[in-house]
Amino acid sequence: VDGHIWVNGYKGGEMGVAYQVDFEANEWTPVIHPAGSPPHNAYDVMADSKNNMYGINMDKEHVWKTDAKTLKTTFFKIPTPGAGGRRGNVDSKDRLWWAQYRGNGIGMFDPVTEKITEWKMPTPWTSPYDAEFDEEAYVWTGGMNNDLAIRLNVETGEFTEYLLPFETNIRNVDVQMSDNPHKLSSFWVGGQLNGLITHVEPLVP
């Protein structure tokens, strides 16, 4: 969008430092937070359509957004204490969707209202790792601890769970739109433990 990318130091000497990187000029500009800011060591960073950066961490109480032009960061409190976030994605409306690994749920931050909406997993200890919205009605996630692919209808709040045929240890998930009559999305995941690729394709809503 603007010739920059975002890089975050998760561990080591620069743990918690995010950089806005200008490839053409080879300039790395650190994001400086004021004293007293909430913890901000991101496990995952994502950019919206204007290249503003979102940050999440599975052990933190906030999600945060850094303005691409001013580098000012705003923190937003997650309603469920300790829910955190592991991986996520930004949709076409610049909403952040993320998996609440510790909180066993899905979170969504709307930048227009600056409000966070949460949905709790129907099965305890699912430990969702990643979440992605399909731009229609469903958000997909996967259980790191129980090998469930999970589809949430965000309009009705209804969950559908699909037990995978073998141990997968789900991490990153990918959503694909379909040309079927119901415009249903499908779910792709790579097996962390088995080297296999699994595709879950619902045929009905």
Where in this protein do the model-derived segments appear?
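Beta-rich, blade/repeat-based domains predominating
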Residues: 1-3, 36-51, 80-95, 99, ...
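Conserved beta-strand positions in repeat-built beta-propeller and related beta-rich domains
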Residues: 7-13, 53-59, 96-102, 139-145, ...
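Solenoidal tandem-repeat scaffolds enriched in leucines and small polar residues
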Residues: 12, 18-23, 28-32, 37-68, ...
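A short loop-to-beta-strand structural motif that recurs across blades of beta-propeller domains
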Residues: 16-19, 62-65, 105-108, 147-150, ...
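Short loop/turn segments that connect beta-strands within beta-propeller blades
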Residues: 22-26, 67-71, 110-114, 153-157, ...
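A generic "binding-loop/recognition-motif" signal
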Residues: 24, 59, 69, 102-103, ...
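Beta-propeller fold detector
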Residues: 29-34, 74-78, 117-121, 160-164
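C-terminal closing repeat unit and adjoining cap/tail of repeat-based domains
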Residues: 145-193, 200-205
